[in-house]
Amino acid sequence: MRYNQFSYIPTSLERAAEELKELGFDLDLQKTAKANLESFLRKLFFHYPDSVYPLSHLIAKNDMDALSFFQSEQELSKEVFDLLALQVLGFIPGVDFTEADAFLDKLAFPIHFDETEIIKHIHHLLATRCKSGMTLIDDLVSQGMLTMDNDYHFFNGKSLATFDTSQLIREVVYVEAPLDTDQDGQLDLIKVNIIRPQSQKPLPTLMTPSPYHQGINEVANDKKLYRMEKELVVKKRRQITVEDRDFIPLETQPCKLPIGQNLESFSYINSYSLNDYFLARGFANIYVSGVGTAGSTGFMTSGDYAQIESFKAVIDWLNGRATAYTSHSKTHQVRADWANGLVCTTGKSYLGTMSTGLATTGVDGLAMIIAESAISSWYNYYRENGLVCSPGGYPGEDLDVLTELTYSRNLLAGDYLRHNDRYQELLNQQSQALDRQSGDYNQFWHDRNYLKNAHQIKCDVVYTHGLQDWNVKPRQVYEIVNALPSTINKHLFLHQGEHVYMHNWQSIDFRESMNALLCQKLLGLANDFSLPEMIWQDNTCPQNWQERKVFGTSTIKELDLGQELLLIDNHYGEDEFKAYGKDFRAFKAALFKGKANQALVDILLEEDLLINGEIVLQLKVKSSENKGLLSAQILDYGKKKRLGDLPIALTQSSIDNGQNFSREPLKELPFRENSYRVISKGFMNLQNRNNLSSIETIPNNKWMTVRLPLQPTIYHLEKGDTLRVILYTTDFEHTVRDNSNYALTIDLSQSQLIVPIASN
């Protein structure tokens, strides 16, 4: 374990003493440091009728227990404080450590003993993570140190778990959206699942916009998947044009219906544990699946601003600007009289994507988004540089396949009976509009590109993204964070994992940092919390996070690739082609072992290199035919210890998100020896070699200059490391599988790897 503490708010002595007193700690500025520490420790054992016994089970020195120390005349020293602090946080002498000083250095322990600062040290200790993954104060509250009185209690600028999660209100309302996405002449209704604690105070809301939460149709999804085996189409030379079109919602009328009291209820919904954490701290949770999902009406428009509007309508309702009904019969309306109107959206992948889309509307009431692994341009999710390009792990998927997965109205037999014919018509229109034949950018994709509206974002934004996420690739977050207005508060966490959540990782206090931010933004707490704009997980060692200033630098280093002419054959033998098509993982294994068709260049680094931004391959290339696709991957190659990309559980249920509520495992990325790590990758239809808007011809056997931008990253390579460049054509995970008999030739003498670099 190593501490990377971003959530602690430096506190004055007076404020620290006041907060400790509010928690029931009997500390006195006039007492000695030793007496105050003893009083603090005894309070920790509030479950015991007598603190003598548990105190005797701590050691103050290697040869003295804590009880004996406090009964002695010996003075409090750094050695004693450090040893006791470690034990209070759950570290066991002789098991987790033998030499405390060395262990503290390894931990990067954030508290440095000064006898005159003991009150502040105790305050800081309570806000510091235990070995279990919870802060000490959260651990104590979870054990019942504070009663669940359904009111707010704060410590170090963060809300504590004092809301009773055993008496939650669970209710359903149906919000009227200014939409008619299925064109049935009726405004669409949006189902909203609400979970909120009982409270006399207006509550802020965490809203998870999740098209998955009302169920998914995996059978329809699998039937809709596309075969990837097809020839690369030769496209006609042309220029693509699109236009920015404002989304115009339909008109709605003020509701004059009576207020209803009897709301639909529910017992369970698949919740997000970060939401659960805040539910216990006085934040209502709502789950909204939007148009075209079970319980709602309308068509699943998948990614456009009509879908975004269906979520926006819910924020409007929370602020009194939209109508909600008690049921589909629309006999009574219901108002959000429990809400303070301030909303933060949460969730990963599609969920985080909807958060970005919502933010670009500038809707009043949306105070903050926490968007994890979020898409900012749907074209860049399903296409790349004029190619159909499947997200990592999902060959054959496209946006209409996702529509089939999430149009959960068809899981309700009555809805299927009444609406499936119309749904199939609209789905067919969507399938045609996305143009899988060419892979080109068009108006359909432009209408699902949130980047063009990034200037309208006015809420605070928090993004998290994995630099090993080949599902929602790093370009998605790179482009949105660099398009954000300079006037807003923005924060970016870049981790070394894949498509995963990070709130329950051991090495970073993400949960607590979000608590401090949300108390600021949604509760109006003046806590003076400041979070860096960007925090990056160092790839060279375990559990090390660093503050960085920017994602993407303008300083570049050009690396020569060699002098040879390299030939890349596109064609595989029939058996090999079928085997790779059946299992793309077998293809990846062969590719990284140098066995698949490829041109390979190894670059031995003569100095450290901190990559920060978009690597570009500038290549001199020619094709034997009038078509060609180019794929590239950059590896950190050679055996050494590296971070894995999938977090593993260190404990099974040590994190309590309330008071014995929604427990979850503590996780972390492992640090193990392996043979390589993918740094970046990229794909291009050579007919789109200049830009997305220009379709060019490919002259047979004529040299072309190609600039292939790869996925942005931040990655630290050290002197002596090997940077491996792999150039090839068909990628059996991502691209169409064209097995035609053509070849590409690369002139390495006229080619470079252009690397954006930053100072370390």
From Swiss-Prot:
UniProt xrefs under PANTHER family: COCE_NOND FAMILY, PUTATIVE (AFU_ORTHOLOGUE AFUA_7G00600)-RELATED, PEPTIDASE S9 PROLYL OLIGOPEPTIDASE
Alphabetical list of HAMAP family matching this protein: Aminopeptidase_S15
Organism: Streptococcus pyogenes serotype M49 (strain NZ131)
Keyword set, alphabetical order: Aminopeptidase, Cytoplasm, Hydrolase, Protease, Serine protease
Family the entry assigns: Belongs to the peptidase S15 family.
Main location: cytoplasm
Name of the protein: Xaa-Pro dipeptidyl-peptidase
Lineage, broadest ranks: Bacteria, Bacillati, Bacillota, Bacilli, Lactobacillales
Known function: Removes N-terminal dipeptides sequentially from polypeptides having unsubstituted N-termini provided that the penultimate residue is proline.
Signal sequence, start to end: none
